């Protein structure tokens, strides 16, 4: 596939075995200069371990140090650190599942940290309150 204006493709996250299969299948059809990036923060580890070069993260914007530490642990092959960081982030991933995605959760977390007003989302969206 010739994609001269495309530098990266964002793919939805999948569990580890399917992520590896999906990345391998896509790689067969893409120029080597096109990167693959995983979306869905809870799937970052599976996607990066499967060969994605990027993680399109919502939590990385609010929690950059933790997100960077996770990427570095994955990239270095530090299984114990990767597992520990995923365990620390598990409550956030569960909130994303519980509230139907990351937007309201991250907006509420940002408000709790004093980074925005508690009522900062545009209507009809509501904070978790």
Explain the meaning of each model-derived region.
Residues 48-52, 90-126:
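Conserved short secondary-structure transition element at the edge of the structured enzyme core
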Residues 2-90, 96-98:
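Catalytic alpha/beta core domains of metabolic enzymes, predominantly
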Residues 1, 126-128:
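Active-site beta->alpha loop and helix N-cap motifs at the rims of alpha/beta catalytic domains
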